[in-house]
């Protein structure tokens, strides 16, 4: 129905030609958009390689040639995102992606600094430039809260997301909020998902909607850490989270394949179709009907909002966003955050 969110699939097999094959399969089975995932080491490496390059690990290497070949393969209706959010090549990635014709990118200073391995000062400087470049290319960017996966509570992650989103607006950008639908360390410890996976995820959307009127794109991918090695269970979990997102009226979702969801191992084209078909079936099942969260959802949303306000007040009192990242105000070592070191001492200050 027209109420369902835009569905993005993640790709990053390591080989651009394999990526193209997977993308074309997903287009044929109804994907609205695709997201380029690069290797994690790319975020900690200055500069880019060039040429047509493949490797046998997770993520597809960013080169102009690799991205250009992928872009040329896309159907005209397929949205294309190249993530640039967490490393030493954040602004450069936005420029390359924008030149080639990407529709969207991904930038979050807090996540990249606290869980992505990049020095907070370096990433803040780079991200400001990246947001400006994204604005020049008219590329909206999502602000994902992946630091939740490290253990940072949702309210702290959301505070960081809101700061970066406000910065994006000030710089002429078009930020999109991307909270996680996941089984995070926070809920494992505190028990918010002992009964169901609905309430806490719904609380996130209620909380954000009560604070700001902004597009919401749930990720990343939805259902992270709820899937198992079983392809049926994995696909079902993705589909149920997709239906929850649709019930909550969000604008977009990112889904993984049924094997990619739990493993950094091989990703097969068939497993991509698993989750696309399951998501389609769940949308058909619910139609305009909705899931109904319990009263806990609104209670946790209120608690989340109070936590966000306290974090933002502490950042303002501190007086420096960069120092707040170093000091753990947006996620501490006790939470599971670890300020990155890649690019440390590389920022030059004018006298």
Language model features by range: what are they?
Residues 52, 56, 120-125, 264-284:
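Short acidic, glycine/proline-enriched helix-loop-strand junctions
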Residues 113-268:
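Catalytic alpha/beta core domains of metabolic enzymes, predominantly
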Residues 13-20, 57, 87, 195-198, ...:
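Electropositive phosphate-/nucleotide-binding environments in soluble metabolic enzymes
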Residues 272-351:
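Long, compositionally biased intrinsically disordered regions
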Residues 31-32, 206-214, 247-251, 280-295:
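Generic secondary-structure signature for well-ordered alpha-helical cores
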